[in-house]
Amino acid sequence: MTGRASIVRAEPGFSLPFFDRLAPAPPPTLVVSRIEAHSSAGDIVLDLHGRGGWIAHAALDRQRGAVSLESSPLTRLLAELVLRPPDLRHLDAAFQAMAASPRRQSSLRIAIGDPFATRCATCERMLVADEFIWAHPSDAGEADLAGSRKHYRCPVCRTQRGGAEQRTGAIDEEDLRRARTEPEDNSQVRDRLRDRFPVVDGGDRLVDELLDLHTPRQLAGLEAILDRIEGDLRAAPVEAALRLAFLHALLPSSRLNGFPGRMSTLRIQAGHVRPPGAGQWRERNPWLSFEDGIRLVRGFIQRLEGGSLGSVQARLGNDLRSVADGTATAVLGVIGPAAARTLSLGGDGGGAGGHGRVRLALGQPPVRPNQERLSLAYWATAWVLGREAAAILPIDALSGSAIRAPWGWQAAALSRSLRAAQPAIARD
């Protein structure tokens, strides 16, 4: 006699590293088994609290239509990549074009790396440092500039002397001078970035504290990368991949990147950022962090194409009617009143007998909110997607004390979502 499959033993899903804590992916085998058991080809599957389009991805792979109401704008961005992964050749071409795009008197990559110029401790050749190791300030002075060492790559020393390509050297006076020097347009850069953050009640200094998590030269580099991502015209899947790569460059290019050890946790409470703990931190070149993000996203797409569910290319529509009666195969949205109205209008357009309506509502309960998740979501959404997307989040909770969601919060959220989606769900 065959035993029943256990949810606990189901193989966990995979996602990008940033979303492992914010919105973990569901087990793919469990999702597929539920879709196969409770729906048939041509039916529409609804995910009320999506975590990156994984339910919709599995539904499309099984010849179903899909409606995914994502839990946040960031998971909506991830779902764009999951449901319509770009061609890797197009992504590589877009990244190379960004690196070679003009920036002042040189290219974007060179302009971002110039403030991180240093000398090799062995051959004294000029090169671009990977990162500097600094100490956190103990007071309001310049103690954070008392760096301990720098990491860089010198191909000449590796060829002539051997050893590892990445080398370590002591901080010299020229490095300290460059670290103290602010870019000429530092105030303009901060103003443009400040406009991306919605204001939290009681947090007049919150946005400046968030920007202070990055050094002036890191801010200039990140703003230059973001300006190029948003300024160029390219396909939506490629732009989504570039934004997700930029998302994974934010934490490594901040004071939260501790040394040694793991990333510190961003926590906003009572309208202020809790400062990182004492110790050392890495000031990493933002372009190198962006390159690491591109490699992460590229590997994610390769794994997506070679996974058990295979690669799908969804045709996105605006509402449920476009899936039921049109040529679209999926609808993406963010959970909220507007999404509920779209579902209700789409459900009214179904034919007799419930044809064209949602046959299966499948998904995970919403992730319980806490201070760390909301702080990270607010900070990252404002950086990656801008002010309007970040304003959707319940940011008013950041101005008060620690968030303590009651135990019945998930059940209440599911109940509200199911009531809103009831007109679109077909009867058994």
Residue ranges and their predicted role:
Residues 355, 411-427:
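A short glycine-rich, Lys/Arg-flanked "PGG" loop and its adjoining helix->strand segment in the class I
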Residues 2-51, 55-56, 60-359, 366-403, ...:
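Nucleic-acid modification enzymes, centered on SAM-dependent nucleic-acid methyltransferases
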Residues 26-27, 409, 413:
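Soluble or luminal CAZymes and related metallo-dependent hydrolases
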